[in-house]
């Protein structure tokens, strides 16, 4: 595998797709509150009957996307094996993260205090469908052996 690794490297996370019950409510949260751009809003490739809304950078760069498939009839999910616990957006500094925390709380969004793992700092909120959303500082980060020194 070592010789093939240069040819077969994973370069990062491309996108995360979740399910939402109400696409308009999801747009209000991620575009209007969080400031993400809608980079696509239309039928899903997997299910032409389902609306698929993509949020991210204006140019749609891979690694900057989160999308939601609109399935209003599905029941609410539960956290468990085979489900996703949360997804995280990155900010550069603790000051930027604190500004997000203050802004979100000012908008009536329940937001945790800062949690410092030693590798990065995190705050957590829930979107209208209950997805856990983390806003994390980029550093100091992890190395192969654990948190960076």
Predicted regions and their residues:
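N-terminal beta-strand motif that seeds the catalytic metal site of vicinal oxygen chelate
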Residues: 1-25, 84-89, 141-149
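Short beta-strand/turn micro-motifs at beta-sheet edges
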Residues: 2-5, 73-78
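Core segments of cupin and vicinal oxygen chelate
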Residues: 19-63
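Short, solvent-exposed loop/turn elements at beta->coil junctions and helix N-caps
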Residues: 41-44, 73-74, 115-118, 122
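Conserved oxyanion/phosphate-binding beta-strand-loop segments in alpha/beta enzyme cores
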Residues: 65-68
């Amino acid at each position: 595998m070592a010789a093939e690794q240069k040819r077969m490297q994973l370069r990062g996370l491309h996108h995360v797709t979740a399910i939402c019950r109400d696409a308009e409510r999801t747009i209000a949260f991620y575009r209007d509150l969080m400031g993400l751009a809608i980079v696509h809003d239309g039928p899903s490739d997997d299910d032409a009957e389902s609306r698929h809304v993509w949020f991210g950078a204006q140019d749609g760069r891979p690694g900057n996307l989160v999308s939601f498939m609109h399935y209003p009839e599905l029941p609410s999910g539960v956290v468990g094996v085979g489900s996703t616990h949360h997804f995280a957006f990155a900010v550069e500094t603790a000051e930027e993260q604190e500004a997000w925390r203050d802004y979100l709380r000012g908008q009536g969004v329940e937001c945790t205090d800062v949690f410092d793992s030693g590798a990065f700092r995190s705050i957590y909120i829930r979107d209208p469908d209950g997805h856990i959303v983390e806003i994390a500082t980029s550093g100091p980060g992890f190395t192969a052996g654990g948190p960076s020194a």
